[in-house]
């Protein structure tokens, strides 16, 4: 039995970490191609941020908004031949796009998340969408980012919703890794996960339960606290290592299914993954104590527990079945669950999860 565990080359986290970005880039050379969110460029770093660089010349390009094949192709055409390193600065889709551009051009990549809303930063994976925002495919990359740099002072100033969504994404990590472990299903490398991966996935879950509420309060006050540092690490590093080396299963497949309904597109990745986690609890018949624990956590930090909270109030059975069918595509990770799963199973699990969430809110 061969197991494989993969990691980013270097993980840097802390208040003020952005101030050592040039130092990290200079290890790769003198020319950097930067893909950055427009909002981050203007309002977080400032448009003149790179003008203070003395060791590295920067070719800065604004991200178009969607991690699509078209955007990857557009940006790749703007990279100068002598570029030494590609840099992604912003949210998950910006980072995934930068990783894809670096892969296409065979360059090292440095990832700088400005929100802790997904576990995308550390992974050797880009999630590709259509230009309209519908999930298209996973792009598996041959290597993880060379550097992931997270400035928690920047994260603390972002709206709390982003950190909470990151907790929703991270919430799936242990449940999906545990399913893969039980089934001997492969992780994202195509091989089995290691003891290390499963332990990190469990640590991720425990950290969320222990520090999630305190971390949310910290970002609401725009303060960097030990609780925030722990949750940023859980959302970014632990979840990234856990999902990639532990494996994905139902929760992310259900997220992908939800993207077929346009009303969900304005909601964050982790918000939809949280619904996938809740549905998976009923899909895999988890003990009531665990179901209560997960719903309570979601309610405390502000994650959605009903379909209405991700834009699907009054969703028809026909549309919900479309979600279930997409989630059960033959190439989806839902087939890493220990038992066979059909679209009808997912349909009923979604309805059960929604009903339970509404019951707890006294809506039924």
Swiss-Prot record:
Upper classification of the organism: Bacteria, Thermotogati, Thermotogota, Thermotogae, Thermotogales
Alphabetical list of InterPro entries matching this protein: ADH_Fe/GldA (IPR001670), ADH_Fe_CS (IPR018211), Glycerol_DH (IPR016205)
Species this protein is from: Thermotoga maritima (strain ATCC 43589 / DSM 3109 / JCM 10099 / NBRC 100826 / MSB8)
Binding residue positions for Zn(2+): 169, 252, 269
NCBIfam families per UniProt: PRK09423.1
Family: Belongs to the iron-containing alcohol dehydrogenase family.
Protein name: Glycerol dehydrogenase
Biological or metabolic pathway of the protein: Polyol metabolism; glycerol fermentation; glycerone phosphate from glycerol (oxidative route): step 1/2
Pfam families xrefs: Fe-ADH (PF00465)
GO molecular function: glycerol dehydrogenase (NAD+) activity; metal ion binding
Protein residues bound to NAD(+): 37, 92-93, 114, 117, 123, 125, 129
Reported function: Catalyzes the NAD-dependent oxidation of glycerol to dihydroxyacetone (glycerone).
Annotated gene: gldA
Gene3D superfamilies found in the cross-reference section: 3.40.50.1970, Dehydroquinate synthase-like - alpha domain
Entry keyword set: Glycerol metabolism, Metal-binding, NAD, Oxidoreductase, Zinc
């Amino acid at each position: 039995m061969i197991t494989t565990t993969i990691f980013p080359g270097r993980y840097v986290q802390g208040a003020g970490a952005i101030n050592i970005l040039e130092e990290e880039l200079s290890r790769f050379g003198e020319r950097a191609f930067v893909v950055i969110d427009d909002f981050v460029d203007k309002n977080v770093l400032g448009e003149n941020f790179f003008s203070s660089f003395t060791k590295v010349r920067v070719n800065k390009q604004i991200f178009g908004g969607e991690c699509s094949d078209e955007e990857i192709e557009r940006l790749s055409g703007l990279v100068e031949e002598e570029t030494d390193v590609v840099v992604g600065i912003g949210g998950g889709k910006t980072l995934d796009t930068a990783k894809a551009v670096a892969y296409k051009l065979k360059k090292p990549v440095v990832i700088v998340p400005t929100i802790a809303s997904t576990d995308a930063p550390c992974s050797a994976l880009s999630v590709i969408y259509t230009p309209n925002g519908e999930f298209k495919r996973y792009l598996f990359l041959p290597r993880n980012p060379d550097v992931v740099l997270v400035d928690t002072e920047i994260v603390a100033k972002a709206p709390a919703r982003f950190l909470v969504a990151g907790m929703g994404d991270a919430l799936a990590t242990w449940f999906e890794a545990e399913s893969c472990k039980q089934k001997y299903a492969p992780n994202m490398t195509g091989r089995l996960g290691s003891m290390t991966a499963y332990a990190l996935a469990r640590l991720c879950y425990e950290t969320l339960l222990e520090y999630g509420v305190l971390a949310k309060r910290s970002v609401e006050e725009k303060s960097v606290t030990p609780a925030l540092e722990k949750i940023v690490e859980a959302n970014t590093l632990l979840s990234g290592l856990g999902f990639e080396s532990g494996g994905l299963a139902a929760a992310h497949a259900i997220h992908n299914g939800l993207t077929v309904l346009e009303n969900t597109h304005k909601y964050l990745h982790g918000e939809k993954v949280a619904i996938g986690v809740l549905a998976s609890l009923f899909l895999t018949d988890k003990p009531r104590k665990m179901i209560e624990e997960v719903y309570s956590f979601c309610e405390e930090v502000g994650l959605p527990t009903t379909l209405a909270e991700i834009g699907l109030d009054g969703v028809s059975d026909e549309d919900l079945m479309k979600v279930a069918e997409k989630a059960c595509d033959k190439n989806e990770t839902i087939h890493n669950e220990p038992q066979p799963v059909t679209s009808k199973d997912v349909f009923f699990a979604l309805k059960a999860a929604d009903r339970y969430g509404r019951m707890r809110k006294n809506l039924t």
